[in-house]
Amino acid sequence: MKQRFCILIAAIAMATTTLDAQTDLKTETYTAYILNDVKRWENLTRRCEQQTDTTDIASLMSLIHCYYGYTMMLAEEKQHNAVERNIARAERYIAIVLAKEPNNAEAIDYSGVFTSYAVSLNRLKAPTLGRRSRQLIDRALSIASNNPRILFDKGNSLFYPPAIFGGDKRQALKYYRRAIDVIEQQGATSRNWIYLKLLLLEARCYQATGRHAEARKLYERLLDREPNFKIVRQKYLPEAVEAAK
């Protein structure tokens, strides 16, 4: 009886530690995102990498998620050398997951996203890499059609490329709205950086399609929700205010 009790206590302690780590990661990725802080993303990713158990799928997926957010910001900042290093690292971890779970939808999606990051490194390969990226994201979506992060990435695959390479901001908006709806239905909006990014991209779609007043209202709503959302306050809201005049 005593041995069973000790095993139970150990299991509870392990579960609590895992939950605390997940909560910390959620808070830290959220903070790095709203502050638009590349260094914070880097430190978080390095720390997560040091603590990752590469035999554990959940641990690997948390690390890949850090690389995903960190590399997204590096790509936006056009830090190409760092992007290239991160792609190599992340793809190595994704390969470990897919070797164990070939139909892991989130890992397949991550593979598609990191392929898309490589487009900025070699424009000559943009058509081939872009097509490969879209195929992977579409495959992930066929496995998990209501996964909000995969819906988000499907939207990104339509938002960022020019029209000649399949870009379509109106279609992107539909996927962003679907992802937003899923997150809100799940009650998962608190300290969720993907949710804030989705709302930001919804507003950017409005701007890109001439709906400037709607964009301005959504940016203002975002700042009401998160006053420290740096890029909205410094860049996107002023642009929308000017465009709406």
Show where each model-derived region lies.
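N-terminal leader/linker segments that initiate helical-solenoid repeat arrays
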Residues: 19-77
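Flexible helix-coil transition and linker loops at the boundaries of alpha-helical arrays
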Residues: 48-62, 93-107, 138-147, 180-193
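Residue-level signature for tetratricopeptide repeat
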Residues: 31, 66, 73, 114, ...
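Structural signature of alpha-solenoid helical repeat junctions
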Residues: 55, 62, 82, 103-106, ...
